[in-house]
Regions:
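Short, basic/aromatic recognition patches
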Residues: 2-28
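Generic marker of residues within folded, mature protein domains
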Residues: 19, 35, 64, 77-79, ...
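Short beta-strand segments
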Residues: 24-58, 64-66, 72-76, 84-85
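Charged, gly/pro-rich active-site loop segments
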Residues: 1-12, 79-127
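A generic secondary-structure signal marking the coil-to-beta-strand transition
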Residues: 17, 25, 50, 81, ...
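A generic local structural motif
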Residues: 13-16, 40-41, 59, 109
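Secondary-structure transition/turn motif
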Residues: 57-59, 126-127
Length: 127
């Protein structure tokens, strides 16, 4: 068995995290209903350098749970090098920020504006 790598310095961990946020496309979003039922879903995201933006159907458990709680826990990366993001959630409807919506569509390859179902964008601000 290969010897595990030594721990990275704080500056190296920060650099690696920022690189993953810039380079990855998908993350796992965890939420819970008001009665504590856990819900986990993969979603594509856009990283603008300080916030993550995801889009999900307005009627989905994810949207309901995150909008009720106002907080999120998300994970991205490989199991042995996972990045956990905890943050606050702010919703904005389609059409509210066209520049960000275009950036989300460009970086994720997914544009909810073209779909029939009603979607909401959720901006995650890491804490």
């Amino acid at each position: 068995m290969e010897e595990p790598a030594p721990p990275r310095s704080r500056s190296q961990r920060t650099a690696d995290t920022l690189e993953r946020l810039r380079g990855d496309v998908d993350l796992w979003v965890a939420s819970a209903s008001a009665d504590g039922e856990a819900y986990l879903v993969p979603l594509s995201y856009h990283w603008d350098g300080s916030t993550l933006t995801i889009a999900t159907p307005t009627a989905s458990p994810t949207a309901r749970n995150l909008l009720r709680a106002g907080r999120v826990r998300a994970a991205l990366g490989q199991t042995r090098d996972v990045v956990i993001v905890e943050g606050t959630v702010e919703a904005f409807p389609i059409g509210a920020d066209l520049e960000l919506e275009d950036a989300h569509a460009s970086s994720t390859g997914f544009d909810p504006r073209t779909l029939r179902d009603e979607y909401v964008y959720l901006r995650i601000t890491p804490q």
